[in-house]
Amino acid sequence: MTKTLIVNAHPDFRNAAHYSVQLEQAFLQLFQTRFPNDTVDVLNLYDTVIPQATVPELLGIWEKQAQHVNLSIEEQRLFAINQQLLQQFKAHHRIVIAMPLHNFNVPARLKDYIDNILVARETFRYTENGSVGLMTDNYRVMLLQASGSIYTRNDRYTPMEFSRLYLDKMFTEIMGFDRFEIVRAQGLQTNGVAVSQALKQAKMDLKAAFERFYD
């Protein structure tokens, strides 16, 4: 069975009232129905230490390693966490990201997580013709996104929704994933949009995406 990892990027991930959390639960229900004897691993980013790409943390650690300088005890601890996150990510061929849209982009902790898994010689490599993905063995990613506005009307909001483009390109173009899926619960704070109908549509879209995800 292909292993599945859910990465929950909501800061208030324990609150079931949040729409991205509801999408995550809908995904889990579909999974349990389809694969009753299997389990899903869940990583709650806001309940986990995620090293940051700063000089005191990852940037400083990588610089010391390049210069063959011993790491401090705290740096060793952070690097061990980094390696655990990276190996966990690589071990799962199905990645599901549940997140709200924050200021047209990904939540801050999700960006920190990407910095831990987007690693040269691990998930991609450099060549004379540019970077090449190493995650090419039937890896797929699904984004479960909740947003207050609607971003699929080809209006002024559409080009401002950076999260989908960023995640799609990082996973497929840089790391080499075979497929990127997005399921949107959108317009949840937009006048004239019925939240119940938006969620119903999102769950219908999720069901179809789920079938493609595990085909």
Swiss-Prot record:
Cofactor entry: FMN
Catalyses which reaction(s): 2 a quinone + NADH + H(+) = 2 a 1,4-benzosemiquinone + NAD(+); N,N-dimethyl-1,4-phenylenediamine + anthranilate + 2 NAD(+) = 2-(4-dimethylaminophenyl)diazenylbenzoate + 2 NADH + 2 H(+)
Gene3D superfamilies xrefs: 3.40.50.360
Oxidoreductase in keyword set: yes
UniProt superkingdom: Bacteria
Cofactor note: Binds 1 FMN per subunit.
EC number per UniProt: 1.6.5.-, 1.7.1.17
Assigned keywords, A-Z: Flavoprotein, FMN, NAD, Oxidoreductase
Claim: Oxidoreductase is one of the keywords in the record: yes
GO molecular function: electron transfer activity; FMN binding; oxidoreductase activity, acting on NAD(P)H as acceptor; oxidoreductase activity, acting on NAD(P)H, quinone or similar compound as acceptor
Family stated for the protein in its record: Belongs to the azoreductase type 1 family.
Subunit structure, as described in the record: Homodimer.
UniProt function note: Quinone reductase that provides resistance to thiol-specific stress caused by electrophilic quinones.
Protein name, per record: FMN-dependent NADH:quinone oxidoreductase 1
Biological source species: Lactiplantibacillus plantarum (strain ATCC BAA-793 / NCIMB 8826 / WCFS1)
Gene: azoR1
